Amino acid sequence: MVNSHRLETDSMGSLEVQADRLWGAQTQRSLMFFDIGSDVMPPDLIRAFAILKKAAAITNQDLGKLPADKAELIITAADEIIAGQWLDHFPLRIWQTGSGTQTNMNVNEVIANRAIAICGGELGSKNPIHPNDHVNMSQSSNDTFPTAMHIAAVAGLQTKLIPSLQALRDSLNEKAECFAGITKIGRTHLMDAVPLTLGQEFSGYVAQLDQGLTQINYCLPGLLELALGGTAVGTGLNSHPQFAKKVAEEIAQLTGYTFISAPNKFAALAGHEAIAFASGVLKSIAASLMKIANDLRWMGSGPRCGLGELALPANEPGSSIMPGKVNPTQCEAMTMVCVQVMGNDATIGFAASQGNFELNVFKPVIIHNFLHSLHLLSDACASFRQHLVVGLQVNESKVKDFLDTSLMLVTALNPHIGYDNAALVAKTAFAQGITLKQAAVDLGLLTPAQFDAWVVPEQMIAPIAD
């Protein structure tokens, strides 16, 4: 009969672990003592850990600290994790030690046991690969976890959020160009204002997302600084003098991103301003997306009793009781994502402020919330673009009706009859239920021909020289 469990040991003693699991005693202890919630460490973070463990093995070998055969086993096991294998062997919750020590050891143990399996050894024997002595060589949880945080953050921004945000920006720009010739009434304070084109309105959305993309680039330099090499408190104890610089170069080589060794490891371990700054950028992007989504659902409200200027794609039934009802569901999903991102940023900001002396011990909750925001925004932008923006259509007759009946067209008369007289025209038209033109003529302020020459909505969308 095959044993269902094996014995794993750590400095506190021995524990039984399921025979088919690659983790060891420290991971098992974490499962026992931190059964809190259902949030586990993100796969992106585990992959980042595997990258840094591979880079550390290569660097330690190059510096003469790790034998080539051991380095090769670690590299092979790490490569499998980088490729997406063994993710079910990383079960630990976010809610653990604030340095992420249990997750660092989870990675060390899985890589060590997988390396042992590759060479035909006995799982749990720590021979020929020891999780601490070999996989964790020249490292501490205190510098590996923040390093993995930055690797995961940069990779997520570059491969997920930037492409998704750029695609949404480009689709909005296509609509801006398509709608350039459609003049509509503007609105401020949710009230009628002077005209602009629908293309101009959409160009504002494009500019907001351009600003978001620019802000992402502003936050990347801080995220490209790595804590690895600081070891326990930032001094680099038990690492080679060249380790920090060389391992950062190796990580840059492996990822294709320009990572460097953080110039001050004490700050890199005890503070997380770079992630807090980047989270602030995500919050700013969420603010832009909230505005865009709200505008589109307001302009698409109706179909008969709302603004109805835009026809939003009808993707699914909107009500379980009202037949034929269709709702702006993509806008609603987007706005919920935005408020979640804002909440995540509040958590990150507070957690980043909680460093004490040489270490911040809120690391897992910081990266959990950051990657959550990043993925939500990436997915929401893709969904919003595909299922709403691409299929947007304009109800031009509705747009024209609002434009033609707006009292705020009277603003064009200011240079000709003065602000006070123009206000009188608007109030008279509203009170008597007549047109601006009729009110102005009845008040004796101008002729019909003058009104037609001066009040031309299409000429009110840009500055005009006197």
Swiss-Prot record:
The organism's place on the tree of life at top rank: Bacteria
EC numbers on record: 4.2.1.2
Any Pfam family hit: FumaraseC_C
GO biological process: fumarate metabolic process; malate metabolic process; tricarboxylic acid cycle
Site, as annotated: Important for catalytic activity: E332
Presence of the UniProt keyword rRNA-binding in the record: no
Pathway the protein takes part in: Carbohydrate metabolism; tricarboxylic acid cycle; (S)-malate from fumarate: step 1/1
Residues reported to bind substrate: 99-101, 130-133, 140-142, 188, 320, 325-327
GO CC term (a single one): cytoplasm
Major localization listed first in the record, in broad terms: cytoplasm
Lyase found in the keyword field: yes
Function: Involved in the TCA cycle. Catalyzes the stereospecific interconversion of fumarate to L-malate.
Other facts: There are 2 substrate-binding sites: the catalytic A site, and the non-catalytic B site that may play a role in the transfer of substrate or product between the active site and the solvent. Alternatively, the B site may bind allosteric effectors.
Protein family membership: Belongs to the class-II fumarase/aspartase family. Fumarase subfamily.
Protein name in the entry: Fumarate hydratase class II
Natural source organism: Synechocystis sp. (strain ATCC 27184 / PCC 6803 / Kazusa)
